[in-house]
Amino acid sequence: MEAVSTLARHIRDEMGKVVVGQEDLKTECLLTLLCQGHALLEGVPGLAKPLAIKTLSRLLGLEFQRVQCTSDLMPADIIGTNVMHLADSTFRLHRGPVFTHLLLVDEINRMPPRTQAALLECMEERQVTIDGARHELSSFFTVFATQNPIDFEGTYQLPEAQLDRFLVKIRVGYPGADEEVRLLSTVHSGFDAHDLDAADLRPVAPDLLVSARKEARSVTVQESLITYVVQLARRTRQWPALSLGASPRAAVSLMRVAQALAAIDGRTYVVPDDVKQAMLPVLRHRVIVRPEADLEGMDADQILLDVIRAVEVPR
């Protein structure tokens, strides 16, 4: 697991020059890339979510584009359109921001449904359809979408089909007191988040991510642990506080993220703790809490922890 370990260590060290704290954010963004998935980042404004993704793209030498979602955003604004050139009366493709490697979709819960549907095709198929013609996207194409908590004005919930396309949902919280002091001290010393060149970031070799992905996929999952993953997923479907449990797609994602966690830890095999650690980020956005449980103050994370405790761990 040399490539994964090298990549993980480098990403954490270099991102630490720009993003203070937020270790879970760094790890789960890396997991997203290792598993070739997409990530939904939820947190209030001002927690460095866009900065983290921009820094990640710089470190990996990948192209970066950003879409700021508004209620009038059209599908053509993100996928592109054919434009007529008057000089020769021919149509030429004007590529939208999805033709990139890392796409930051800021405040995705302000995006209108038609545009969400266009983005869904990009995420699921890694291709776009423009005027009936299909165009392939990069194998590195990854969506990092941010959203504010649902009780913020002007936002609305994403449909289940859209949520299920995100490998993980990353909850970005406030930094600790010591981390916030370090952050302010860094800014006071002259750090400018808009000038990443001044951070002296050291990018990794271009093929390191490709090698790391292959290593993560090669991690062994014993039959007993595959059964454990299935039991966890099936238990969520029967859990009284949930109206919607984890789908088979979610179970596959749970196994893949557990493999990547094992690889980051330098192991060639998955252990039960990898599955437990993957459970919350992989499933918290795929299950639906019943209204009566929500009124009692229960949230998806609490319920998933109860599910983990209820399922016997393989030995």
Per-segment meaning from a language model:
Residues 44, 78, 146:
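P-loop (Walker A) phosphate-binding loop of NTP-binding proteins
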Residues 2-47, 234:
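Pre-Walker A (pre-P-loop) alpha-helix and adjacent loop at the N terminus of AAA/AAA+ ATPase modules
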